[in-house]
Amino acid sequence: MTIDHEVKRRRTFAIISHPDAGKTTLTEKLLLFAGAIHIAGSVKARKASRHATSDWMEIEKQRGISVASSVMQMEYRGCVINLLDTPGHQDFSEDTYRVLTAVDAALMVIDAANGVESQTLRLLQVCRARNTPIITFVNKLDREVREPLDLIDEIERTLGMDVVPFTWPVGSGKRFHGVYDLRHELMRVFRPGMDHAEQKDTTIITDLGDPAVTKRFGANLEQARQEIDLIKGAAPEFDQAAFLAGQQTPVFFGSAINNFGVQEVLDTLVDLAPPPGTRKAIQREILPTENKFSGVVFKIQANMNPAHRDRIAFVRICSGEFRRGMSLKVVRSGKDVRTSTVVSFLSQRRELLETAYAGDIIGIPNHGTLQLADTLTEGDNLQFTGLPFFAPEIFQTVEIADPLRSKQLKLGLTQLGEEGAIQVFRPHLGSILLLGAVGQLQFEVVTHRLKHEYGVEARVAPAKYQLARWVTAEMPRELQRFIDANTHRIAYDAVDAPTFLASFSAEISVAEENWPGIRFHKMREHAGLLFQTAS
């Protein structure tokens, strides 16, 4: 098989949503319909022995939430699908942001009862900024929900993109009868309890004018007919170019927990979602079909297998072909990486990988050699851009009861910090480490993982700082003068980038006014080399 052929059959996408919209359930059902698993994990009954395939971390199983990104690969209809299930909790949106830099499309899940929620909107803004194509799945039609016309209007108005319904619901809640497929002009009938693999086939009705059909579904069908006529007259025609530009979204309705509407979404991902495209590096644009391998680390996960205390670097292949045993260079350090134990994923389950192509996600065992946003090549000096680190919005100090466990604490925080799940800052003065995060749950997860994965009982307490800005200057001497004058407010992050800490935004404003030669940044990119200026 040629590289061109293999690239064309790749589909790499992320599933995004507000917490509790049903994202993890839909992930499970996509795996089920693609034949990757034979029984979907029960997301609802988390205390049972069966858990969602994509929720592998112990705290996820205990609390029934996704706090880490999972990667799953499967084959369906001749295509290789790389599915990335992102954290559902808003405190982990930074991890989700990085995942979105590794995909070519996104599947947005909306709770039909709640519409477009805050986390959904934030993630969609990221997709829009990157012109990522978006397919929308309106979930939970088997419950009492909002009027579908209102939902469509809200999606269009809030997200600022044209909406093209591909299916339309007939009723909802206890009177949910199915969906009408507007492209194929047929109705798929819903049956309660369709949550078993052997029940995934649905009854199809092609003639909605049949008196028996009208009698069977009554007023709900009549209302759906009127809405369908309205949609046909008002909704724009589907435009593949507009979809690929992130300006138009196909919309599907269904109930993921009942396996209903999932098949249509999976088929549309194969038919309409784009194969891997060009990727921007500082030096030039990289074509996916280039012969030489290139890839970027978008995620690092510690302790995927706690028995081995391992760390895996998740790499999005941007061009060329991966071959087991090939020599890859880490552009940042110039060091070579061994590739004899590179793996592919089905969540925490992995298999040794012989070959992979642009668009695929591979896992490279990492012993500190790789960092987030590292570029890997066959020798070319390239640096991919767009993988961000955001300034924390909450700070806490961390201490341990047993000083003899200090080494384990440092190891744990170093590895968890490399994941990007938490940011660890070393103060210029003093020895108490600072943890920075965008949400409180991140601290809970870190203390839980320190205890269960590193054997460290850690205590966190609110710090006096609430804001941070990375600082740079054109003149190194000026930056050193600023650091010397503000030693009590300076800390260094995982890549030793100097950071100014503040309790109030006014303190940053004063510093900016008093030090015009210093730049204050809300965001940094790889190794502290690229910054976005903002106060």
Swiss-Prot record:
Gene Ontology cellular component annotations, sorted alphabetically: cytosol
Places the protein is found: Cytoplasm
By its UniProt entry, which Pfam families does this protein fall under?
Answer: EF-G_D2 (PF22042), GTP_EFTU (PF00009), RF3_C (PF16658)
- Provide the binding site for GTP: 17-24, 85-89, 139-142
> Chief subcellular site?
cytoplasm
| Residue intervals passing through the bilayer | none
Q: Name one GO biological process term.
A: regulation of translational termination
Query: Which InterPro entries is this protein grouped with?
Result: EF-G-like_DII, EFG_III/V, G_TR_CS, P-loop_NTPase, PrfC, RF3_C, RF3_dom_3_sf, RF3_GTP-bd
Q: Where is the tr-type G domain?
A: 8-277
Q: Could you state a single Gene Ontology molecular function term?
A: GTPase activity
Q: Tell me the superkingdom of the source.
A: Bacteria
Keyword Cell division among UniProt keywords: no
Q: Which UniProt keywords apply?
A: Cytoplasm, GTP-binding, Nucleotide-binding, Protein biosynthesis
Checking HAMAP family in the record gives:
Rel_fac_3 (MF_00072)
PANTHER family (alphabetical): PEPTIDE CHAIN RELEASE FACTOR RF3
Cited function: Increases the formation of ribosomal termination complexes and stimulates activities of RF-1 and RF-2. It binds guanine nucleotides and has strong preference for UGA stop codons. It may interact directly with the ribosome. The stimulation of RF-1 and RF-2 is significantly reduced by GTP and GDP, but not by GMP.
Which family does this protein fall into?
Belongs to the TRAFAC class translation factor GTPase superfamily. Classic translation factor GTPase family. PrfC subfamily.
Q: Can you name this protein?
A: Peptide chain release factor 3
Gene that specifies this protein:
prfC
